[in-house]
């Protein structure tokens, strides 16, 4: 029994840590392809097209033993699917990869940690949340948002010196060859513009999360919903990319690094990572998977310092670390809020139960008296 408990704790942890490592590794590879001249818009179209082809049949296999009364082809759900594709695929991915082209993987990681803060601010703007200063969860989310945004400003405005300058590079031939194969950071860059693109991408995915939460409540087959909005988002990206990239040579992919990257990114992003996230959520709850997002800082720093020179700045790591602290603070506030709501609902149920019990105790003697009285 104890071994099973340990396994149930260890397997999701290791799986999520590996998912974050693979995400950063693919981000570095994408940076390499974009630096080599590949269009970010074409890359988004091809990866999502390939991923959608895999995800559609896989989603039906994933939910083959589940039934739902709600049809995915109802107008309310189709509108939601269109908006999910627009915000989560079209807006988010195009802006994110353009931002990556101008910055580096650790900047992408740090800006991605702003999602809970943006979601919190968005919920206030939309009237879904209220600022109750007496509430511990509200104070935690507000403080976490301030800290997280501070990390983003540090990331954007301060680079600092390189952690591993070329003069301190290892004489190891393998390490010297890695920067020639992969690119972590390149000059000239446009750090500020890259952060702006990434910030808008984060805002877009925050909108996506709001709509997705409501959609999953109406239609709980998560993988099917993901496959449909992936197809819709791919079509939107294709129409936009045909306008942006009118040179046919930009659409020609040779059987080289770019093609392998498209296949790997499409397979991992659409099927592998999504499946692992869904399974871990089912096993550990809705707040388990997001807690591993800051692991990307560790992997981005490890890869950047181990295999690349003149690539990772002290300011990048500092800003990402500050953003990570803010991320965990906001996440703790969200968890606290969820516990408070659950406790409040349980109290209401217990009060209703006591109220009904009192009514029953009051009604029973009357019924007895009625039965005993003559007709």
Curated annotation (Swiss-Prot):
Broad class of the protein's primary localization: membrane
Superkingdom field: Eukaryota
Cysteines joined through disulfide linkages: none
GO cellular component, one term: endoplasmic reticulum
GO molecular function: transmembrane transporter activity
Family: Belongs to the drug/metabolite transporter (DMT) superfamily. Plant drug/metabolite exporter (P-DME) (TC 2.A.7.4) family.
Protein name: WAT1-related protein At1g70260
